[in-house]
Swiss-Prot record:
PROSITE patterns: DEAH_ATP_HELICASE (PS00690), DS_RBD (PS50137), HELICASE_ATP_BIND_1 (PS51192), HELICASE_CTER (PS51194)
Name of the featured protein: Dosage compensation regulator mle
Pfam family, one: DEAD
Annotated GO CC locations: chromatin; chromosome; cytosol; MSL complex; nuclear chromosome; nucleolus; nucleus; ribonucleoprotein complex
Annotated spans, 9 X 7 AA tandem repeats of G-G-G-Y-G-N-N: 1202-1263
GO molecular function terms noted in the UniProt entry: 3'-5' DNA helicase activity; 3'-5' DNA/RNA helicase activity; 3'-5' RNA helicase activity; ATP binding; ATP hydrolysis activity; chromatin binding; DNA helicase activity; double-stranded DNA binding
Length: 1293
């Protein structure tokens, strides 16, 4: 009897029939079939993944039968011989634990604590019994009632789903509640960010007697008042959802925001006729404004159907899933756990695990006896502090499902624990039953640790050790192996279950990133269900009590460290020892920055202590004065240079590690140091960046020794804080900052801020010194500031939107979203969870039963924000998936595309001009990416030179490109045809409509919603509800001069919170693009004004606005059609095909300009006048086969010497001569960047000494393209490649 027949026979005894689900998976060139078999009431899912359907079914049945054997429902002897049934490895010390739903008595690991089926205490409302179903009404179903009450007045984007409690009325209600219950607790404020970018975190915890527990809220704001109001709002909304307080019953007051002047929009009669035909063809309902009477002060009337309601087609959704657990099985024959598929061919397809284990044992014994190199590494490993505890650690792991190991960085826990487990299994003849996942918080640590462990085992990667990170994997053998991976990669793998895994090691659990906290909830439920799975949690030396308690008071093992003493110096010590005084120039620049940031400060009276002015009397007056001159907000490169000179004077060998908060500062400091005479000398100093996005070959350099007499200076983010260990560090310089993501739910503000790191962070960084000898730590904050720092930063789960995590919860079949998150180590506020659920319903990712729709399932598998994923789906429908993929990658990558030279605060004109007349950071990025890709294909050297010339961040370009390719691959795997992903070349020189680019920019409004702003003047813009903000200085649209744009509307990617909010990654969009894709509400207000989302006013015929609004639900239906049958999008039914055509017409930038005269605008790269720089630049020319000084003048933005891409819009040369009329430009005469090859007329370098493309160069010349000669006396000075290529590889980008 075959295994499938056997399973049917077994199920027939209980009158149950197995249910099979088979689907294709994998890319087209490696097509496989995934079969899942379910047998109720068991929630375990048997899986087979093979190259044909028959084998997939057979293997799925075998997997399920193996499960039945493990839980004791079947005896091994009863199973047919060909089934190969096995309960797993011989180490099953806790036999008999069954899957929830099995008939046997399940053994609970966490006695007396909540298990997988129980709702966490944090979300149990008043009068709730603890089960899951009892609070469905209070959490979701009364939301629609609240929405119906005041739909027209819900100007707060979320008020209607939270009992109409808003930022304006919540604080008063909270005060009443506190007085009634005699609560005297008050807000605790924590300053976030440096002085000029100050914001505040407000936290308040109140004990709620009715619930017998404490409810906490943490929210941020630009000042204390704003933060406290947001905090009160979160608390009141939580109390509402917990049935403690009532909904708001008063009248919501509409704030008197700045009223925007209606913007005129008019369409051609031909286009209006096309819209009418589509409406008729799809039978779309249209609101008739002529039947509507608007009172002068009355509320506006909706012109479209409410998109937030679930339509009737979704009412019959999938059956609501019960809370479940990720399926797990120990290593078993014929299964490759790393690829989550069956082994269909080759020797391993038929070899038993016991036979493999014997081979592994013989091999290891032989190596220990005969391999001298292996024995040397063993001796080294025996000297690590953790080696003394090897036996104790292994005993604890074997005897307990969960163990916490706490130890100093460098004690050896990251590299040794997994090896101890694997070697112990191998030596006992069970090596094939050990498959170990080790998670790391970052890709660089996963790769570097894997390489280190493989080296210690004298193996190549891919033998017993491998790694898997985004974009790159080297998998080990299927049995008896260790895989290092990021937490995100492991979470992605969980969709297929965790079959074939014996141990999961989670490193750096103290970092509390959102993925790690998410994984802990999953592992806690898995261990409670499968006690044979072993989980090891590893942490640095911080308090692990919370983690131990969460896992049922699991054992905690302390590993002693091995470090030399580290002497710490604070800012006042450093200034005194270096005798540092800030230069007049740096003081002037500081004042400029402070004046600019005060432009839109929300609270000009918010006084905050400048701790640089707090200095003890024991320091000299000169030191105190110098400290007071330094801003806490900025990193003084002058001070860093003085400190490095001081270290140099000590003549103490050892590497220097500098902690910086982000790539932009790393790059700027690297360029600064390379341009100094001392630190730019590569014979004395090697300056290396350490960042997760740089190429692997460059990452490795930080670990490599340098020649004698050379000092290694490593510029790193907090990646070097705990994730990696660099042995030769003696000096640590700590800027004391970190980059943090902040989220305020009531106004949907996600922002990024550079904040003060916590004391725990600083202690970890200090510990990186002193690995090989006594060390030194230079902490660049005052002692007073250090004392004021928080002990720990807020966990990321409290400051990030939850809808991405919610999608993953549903994809992994973990039950309801709020149920799962209620079991987190520190559950996020219940109001944030509800908002995530409601948002996913509105996006049609969830059906009426809160289960994934086809769209939701697709978006859950895309590693980008769900709105961006939805944008990509429509991009595929409109045939521009390639452009949408690169835009989505750019919006998901928060590193800068362009680099700025020292002292340069805005982009150069030649960088701004990459967007042409499109006024778009996204277009500039696309053009730069396409140019970069062409150079990359010519070789690494040409790529590096090109990036240096254009001022591009080469690492960012690589990441964006890799992410784009991954997104397109995932779309293909989902079934979307390749024809919709054809590459589209963007030519920024074209002044006019580009239909493909126009529809792509329109779709950005959908992907980045609600991030719409309106330009007012200079840098000032208005965002949602007319809140003032600034254009970010790194935007191509930023200028400190008077500029106007063809349209004032912009879509932006992210917000940076300072005293004002700055908008980054901006693209100009047309009014029709905003109405069609950048809105949720279209209303008719008084005086026939059409109002979008309660703040954008348009002068457009109301009937026409209603017709355009009628297309929006049709577009939602089109997305549903595309996700149901992706392969059919090239053969849409005629009505939908006509819809696509008319939407493309509406997205053309000029579509709303019929009969209207609009200003063409004065764009930022065109705004400089000749008088600004003393006349136009000279026409470009060649000199002895090389460019003259200005060449393409990367540093020349024309401010001082004129230049730029032609002050009168001459672009790249009016006569089409490539990148400039004279000299052949970009390959005019078959010669690279010059006339006869290479980068000059006769292949000659970049000026005589390779000195870059000009220091103060004037861009592309005035009207004819040219190369602009700007300032001959500076020829050859500074910048670019120093002395050929000796400025260090990283100077190239």
């Amino acid at each position: 009897m075959d295994i499938k027949s056997f399973l049917y026979q077994f199920c027939a005894k209980s009158q149950i029939e197995p249910k099979f689900d088979i689907r294709q998976t994998g890319p087209k060139n490696r097509q496989r079939f995934l079969c899942e078999v379910r047998v109720e009431p068991n929630t375990y899912i048997g899986v087979g993944n093979s190259t044909n359907k028959k084998d997939a079914e057979k293997n799925a049945c075998r997997d399920f039968v193996n499960y039945l054997v493990r839980v004791g429902k079947l005896n091994t002897n009863d199973v047919p011989a060909d089934a190969g049934a096995s309960g797993g490895g011989p180490r099953t010390g806790l036999e008999g634990a069954g899957m929830a739903g099995g008939s046997g008595q399940q053994k609970r690991v966490f006695d007396g604590q909540s298990g997988p089926q129980d709702l966490g205490e944090a979300y149990r409302p008043l009068n709730h019994d603890g089960g899951d179903g009892g609070n469905r009404y209070s959490v979701i179903d009364r939301i629609q009632e609240q929405r119906d009450m005041n739909e027209a007045e819900a100007f707060d984007v979320n008020a209607a789903i939270h009992g109409n409690w808003t930022i304006e009325n919540a604080k008063e209600r909270l005060n009443i509640y506190k007085q009634t219950n005699n609560i005297r607790d008050d807000y605790k404020y924590t300053p976030v960010g440096p002085e000029h970018a100050r914001s505040f975190l407000a936290e308040l915890s109140i004990y709620v007697p009715a619930l017998n527990r404490t409810v906490t809220a943490r929210e941020s704001g630009s000042n204390k008042k704003s933060a406290s109001k947001s905090c009160a709002l979160s608390l009141v909304r939580q109390l509402f959802h917990l049935n403690v307080i009532e909904p708001f019953s008063g009248t919501l007051k509409k704030k008197k925001d700045e009223q925007l002047k209606p913007y005129p929009v008019k369409l051609s009669p031909n286009l209006i006729n096309k819209i009418d035909e589509v409406i008729k063809g799809l039978d779309l309902p249209v609101v008739n404004p002529r039947n509507i009477k608007i009172e002068l002060d009355g509320p506006p009337i909706p012109l479209i159907v409410n998109l937030s309601r679930i339509d009737s087609s979704q009412q019959d959704g999938e059956k609501r899933q019960e809370s479940s657990v990720i399926p797990w099985a120990p290593p078993q024959a014929n299964w490759n756990t790393w690829h989550a598929c069956n082994i269909d061919e080759g020797e391993l397809a038929t070899t038993s695990i016991d036979d493999l284990s014997m081979d592994y044992e013989r091999s290891l014994r032989d190596r220990r006896q005969n391999d001298n190199e292996y024995r040397q590494f063993l001796e080294f490993r025996e000297k690590l502090p953790i080696a003394a505890m090897r036996s104790e650690i292994l005993t604890a792991i074997n005897d307990n499902p969960v163990v916490i190991i706490r130890g100093n960085t460098g004690c050896g826990k990251t590299t040794q624990i997994a090896q101890y487990i694997l070697d112990d299994y191998i030596c006992s003849g069970q090596g094939g039953y050990a498959n170990i996942y080790v998670t790391q918080p970052r890709r660089i640590s996963a790769i570097s640790v894997a390489e280190r462990v493989a080296r210690e085992r004298c193996e190549q990667l891919g033998d017993t050790v491998g790694y898997s990170v985004r974009f790159e994997s080297v998998f080990p053998r299927p049995y008896g192996a260790i895989l290092f991976c990021t937490v995100g990669v492991l979470l992605r793998k969980l969709e297929a279950g965790l079959r074939g895994v014996s141990h999961i090691i989670v490193d750096e659990i103290h970092e509390r990133d959102v993925n790690s906290d998410f994984l802990l909830v999953i592992l806690r439920d898995m261990v409670d269900t499968y006690p044979d799975l072993h989980v090891i949690l590893m942490s640095a030396t911080i308090d692990t009590t919370k983690f131990s308690k969460y896992f049922g008071i699991c054992p905690v093992l302390e590993v002693p460290g091995r470090a030399f003493p580290v002497q710490q110096f604070f800012l006042e010590d450093i200034i005194q020892m270096t005798d540092f005084v800030p230069s007049a120039e740096s003081r002037r620049k500081r004042k400029e920055v402070e004046d600019e940031e005060q432009l839109l400060s929300e609270d000009k009276d918010e006084a905050e202590i400048n701790y640089n002015k707090v200095c003890e009397d024991k320091y000299s007056q000169k030191t105190r004065n110098a400290m007071a001159m330094l801003s806490e907000s900025d990193v003084s490169f002058e001070l860093l240079e003085a400190l490095l000179m001081h270290i140099k004077s000590k003549n103490i060998p050892g590497a220097i590690l500098v902690f910086l908060p982000g790539w932009n500062l790393i790059f700027a400091l690297m360029k600064f140091l390379q341009n100094t005479n001392i630190f730019g000398d590569t014979s004395q100093y090697q300056i290396l960046p350490c960042h997760s996005q740089i190429p692997r070959d460059e990452q490795r350099k930080v670990f490599e020794p340098v020649p004698e007499g050379v000092t290694k200076i490593i510029l790193s983010t907090n990646i070097a804080e705990t994730s990696i260990t660099i042995d030769d560090i003696v000096f640590v310089i700590d800027i004391c900052k970190a980059r943090m993501k902040l989220f305020t739910s009531h106004n949907n503000l996600t922002s990024y801020a550079t904040v003060w790191a916590s004391k725990t962070n600083l202690e970890q960084r200090k510990g990186r010194a002193g690995r090989v000898r006594p060390g030194f730590c230079f902490t660049l904050c005052s002692r007073a500031r250090f004392q004021a720092l928080e002990d720990n930063l807020t966990p990321e789960m409290f400051r990030t939107p939850l809808h991405e995590m919610a999608l993953t919860i549903k994809l992994l079949r973990l039950g309801s979203i709020h149920h799962f998150l209620s079991k987190a180590l520190e559950p996020p506020p219940v109001d944030a969870v509800i908002e995530a659920e409601v948002l996913l319903r509105e996006m049609r990712c969830l059906d009426a039963n809160d289960e994934l729709t086809p769209l939701g399932r697709l978006l859950a598998r895309l590693p980008i924000e769900p709105r961006l994923g939805k944008m990509m789906v429509l991009g595929a429908v409109f045939g521009c998936a390639d452009l949408m993929a690169i835009m989505a990658s750019y919006s998901s990558t928060f590193s800068e595309v362009f680099s700025l030279d020292i002292g340069q605060r805005r982009l150069a004109n030649h960088q701004k001009a990459l967007s042409g007349t499109k006024c778009s950071d996204h277009v500039a990025m696309i053009v730069a990416s396409q140019m970069w890709r062409r150079e990359k294909q010519r070789g690494e050297h040409m790529e590096a030179r090109f990036c240096d010339w254009k001022g591009l961040q080469m690492s960012t370009m690589n990441v964006i490109w890799d992410a784009k390719q991954q997104l397109l691959d995932l779309l293909q795997q989902a079934g979307f045809p390749e024809e919709c992903m054809i590459s589209h070349e963007v030519d920024e020189r074209i002044d006019g409509d580009d239909p493909v680019l126009d529809v792509s920019l329109a779709l950005l409004c959908l992907g980045l919603y609600p991030n719409i702003c309106v330009h007012k003047e200079k840098r000032k813009v208005l965002t949602t509800e007319s809140k003032a903000a600034l254009l970010h200085k790194t935007s191509v649209n930023c200028s400190n001069l008077a500029v106007t744009f063809p349209y004032p509307f912009f879509v932006f990617g992210e917000k940076i919170r300072t005293r004002a909010v700055s908008c980054k990654q901006l693209s100009m969009v047309s009014p029709l693009q905003v109405i069609l894709f950048g809105s949720r509400k279209i209303d008719l207000a008084a005086n026939n004004i059409v109002r979008v989302d309660n703040w954008l006013n348009f002068d457009i015929e109301p009937e026409l606005a209603a017709k355009i609004g009628a297309l929006k639900p049709a577009l939602e239906d089109l997305i549903t059609v595309a996700c149901d049958n992706p392969s059919d999008i090239l053969r849409l039914e005629e009505p939908y095909a006509q819809l696509v055509k008319v939407v493309k017409d509406l997205c053309v930038k000029s579509a709303g300009d019929f009969g209207l005269q609009r200003e063409s605008g004065i764009l930022p790269h065109q705004s400089r006048q000749f008088s600004d720089g003393g006349g136009p630049p000279k026409r470009g020319r060649f000199e002895t086969g090389r460019f003259t000084n200005s060449s393409f003048g990367r540093r020349g933005n024309g401010r001082t010497f004129g230049g730029g891409y032609g002050n009168n819009g001459g672009g790249y040369g009016n006569n089409g001569g490539g990148y400039g009329n004279i000299g052949g430009g970009y390959g005019n005469n078959a010669g690279g960047y010059g006339n006869n090859g290479g980068y000059g007329n006769n292949g000659g370098g970049y000026r005589n000494n390779g000195g870059g493309y000009g220091n103060n160069g004037g861009g592309y010349g005035n009207k004819r393209g040219g190369f602009g000669d700007s300032f001959e006396s500076n020829r050859g000075s500074g910048g670019g490649f120093r002395n050929g290529d000796q400025g260090g590889r990283w100077g190239n980008f």
